A protein has these predicted regions:
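Alpha-helical membrane-anchoring segments
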Residues: 1-599
């Protein structure tokens, strides 16, 4: 891998696309094992520069300058200042909400332009996705001037809270009498909380992009709780995120996440170490025992045990060890450059571990028992546990982000398929700030075949995860022309249509397909999607839908997760067993070329 030259798959560009789909998938999956996406070093370098100059330097300079805590380079002077903590959270929310943090740039499928977010959400006429149809005043799927106004108002309210100096707080002075920087004025939290909720009720994309499931509770704590309660509540919040993520890794999915993530890391140059995460490369690229150890000892165990230690420890050295472990944990994730690129989030959580548990240790009056009311403690714990519990029991009702299933591998997912030339119709959607990814790559100077092979690497990546084997199985069993179709990873395709995705299949489900169909008008069979819901924690199956954009849902069914994870990504034994629970009536003899066919 060079600085400007990537590791492109070693295939014949002129003939590769003529091969059967699963032959292509196998070649690209095997290439992924050793090279990941094969991105040139320039791309991760771009992300590092964004982290250093925009997030860290610009952010801390603005925050320290407006808070009166000394120059930004004097980290020892401000790292444990409460107002800095508050403003750094708000700064992170601001960048997320603009689209300059997670799901940014080429790793997330944004090539030209590299930003989604604000380009979509500050523009009337773009697609929006309401979370609940029953909420009055949220009808439709088109962004209005009102939507743009409340979104821009949300951004402005965050910026205002960041730039205004802190105000004195009696509850803070009672604990830290020498503090002079104060806290963010509680009334400044009213507007961002209200506007984020309004934005979310009108368009779930903005709420999820702003990481509302984590930052909205924090902003509520900033606005209504006295200082000690605020710190303890923040500890409960971060531990809920960690533990929820750890619990979500139980099961068969997460082990499949680690190998392709390590393979894509520019910080793991050793090919043998990457191959060590697979059973018997190139014959068997299911996860190895080493990958299982990394997943469930380095991941699941750390995310559950360490937060509990931090939450209850009153020993400095034990707390220090826990903090160091969580900082290393988040730095490791950052170094792998996951496809959703939540880099700012990981750096923030590393800082929060230091600030909350070393800056305000339990033994100094900031433990759970030090909250002003046990009723308040129980209420906060119950509120923080509600959506993770509901989302794991009923994943169809709750996004995987409020369910705290980050990195779990248990995600709602989809593959989109188009008949030859049909994908180009997506480019007729207007307004739409970006074109299809293959067109973005060609606009950067890549030949059409190279652009297409690059995008097919993303479906090979999907095939290396548990859902991929099931999705490909449904498509192979139901589409007799699959080899001729253009197949897309829905997470990437979604990014070009609504400006954001974070591995969240609920953003590219039936609602988005219906919105696209209303604008494009695909013929039956032209645009067929296989979409699957996350696995419920008490279930052994995943439920899928086969969707024809012109006809709606045409089949529902499920597959057993064990069958999916036991197969190779390229399905050498054919589709895994599928159980059909419903199929739309289909008049005899009326199957059009390229339309789904009954088994």
């Amino acid at each position: 891998m060079g600085f400007k030259t990537g590791d492109f798959p070693p295939v014949d560009v002129d003939t590769f696309l003529d091969k059967p789909l699963f032959e292509r998938t196998k070649a690209l999956a095997l290439h992924w094992v050793q090279f990941g996406f094969g991105s040139p070093k320039m791309i991760p370098t771009t992300y590092v520069l964004k982290l250093v100059f925009l997030y860290l330097l610009a952010g801390t300079a603005l925050i320290t300058w407006t808070s009166g805590v000394g120059p930004f380079w004097d980290v020892a002077g401000w790292w444990n200042e409460p107002v800095v903590y508050q403003k750094l959270v708000l700064w992170t929310v601001l960048l997320e909400a603009i689209g300059l943090a997670g799901s940014w740039g080429p790793i997330a499928g944004k090539f030209k332009p590299m930003t989604g977010g604000v380009l979509f959400w500050a523009r009337p006429g773009t697609i929006r996705l309401r979370p609940w149809k029953a909420v009055p005043g949220t009808g439709g799927d088109t962004r209005t001037v009102f939507d743009v106004v409340i979104y821009l108002g949300f951004l402005a309210s965050l910026l205002l809270a960041i730039v205004l100096p802190g105000v004195p707080s009696e509850s803070l002075s009672a604990v830290l009498p020498d503090n002079t920087s104060g806290l963010v004025a509680p009334w400044l939290m009213i507007a961002p909380v209200v506007l984020l909720v309004l934005c979310g009720l009108r368009d779930k994309t903005i709420f999820l992009a702003s990481r509302g499931e984590q930052y909205l509770p924090a902003m509520v704590f900033f606005g209504v709780l006295p200082f000690v309660d605020m710190i303890v509540a923040a500890k409960l919040l971060i531990c809920a995120v960690w533990i929820g993520a750890g619990v979500s890794k139980f099961g068969r999915h997460f082990t499949n996440v680690i190998p392709p993530m390590i393979s894509n890391s520019p910080c793991v140059p050793s090919k043998w170490l990457k191959r060590a995460h697979y059973r018997d490369f190139p014959r068997d690229i299911r996860p190895s025992r080493f990958a299982t150890f990394m997943a469930h000892v380095g991941g699941t165990t750390v995310e559950i045990i360490t937060p509990l230690v931090l939450l209850f420890s009153t020993n400095y050295w034990l707390t220090l060890a826990g903090v160091v472990l969580m900082v290393v944990f988040h730095l490791f994730i950052t170094s792998t450059f996951p496809l959703a690129v939540p880099l700012e989030w990981n750096l923030l959580f590393g800082y929060l571990a230091v600030f909350l548990f070393l800056g305000f240790p339990n033994q100094d009056g900031f433990g759970i028992a030090d909250m002003s009311s046990p009723v308040l403690t129980v209420a906060i714990i119950a509120a923080l546990a509600f959506f993770p519990a509901l989302g794991n029991l009923r994943p169809d009702l709750v996004s995987f982000l409020p369910s705290m299933r980050q990195y779990a591998g248990n995600w709602a997912s989809a593959l989109w398929t188009f008949t030859p030339g049909a994908e180009e119709k997506l480019n007729t959607i207007s307004p739409r700030p970006s074109r299809n990814q293959v067109d973005q790559l060609q606009a950067l100077g890549y030949p059409a075949a190279v652009a297409e092979i690059t995008m097919q690497q993303t479906i090979a990546w999907r095939s290396m995860h548990s859902q991929g084997r099931g999705l490909f199985s449904v498509l192979a069993a139901r589409l007799d022309d699959l080899d001729r179709r253009t197949v897309r990873e829905a997470e990437f395709a979604c990014n070009s249509l609504i400006g954001f995705n974070f591995g969240e299949g609920h953003l590219h489900g039936l609602d988005l397909i219906e919105a696209v169909q209303k604008r494009v008008g695909f013929a039956p069979g032209e645009f067929v999607v296989c979409w699957v819901e996350s696995q419920a924690i008490h279930s052994k199956v995943q439920h899928y839908q086969l969707i024809d954009a012109a006809l709606g849902v045409i089949e529902r069914g499920h597959w057993t997760v064990a069958d999916a994870v036991n197969e190779q990504p390229w399905l050498p034994n054919g589709p895994i067993p599928l159980t059909v629970t419903w199929r739309a009536p289909q008049p005899a003899g009326e199957t059009a070329p390229g339309q789904p066919v009954a088994p």
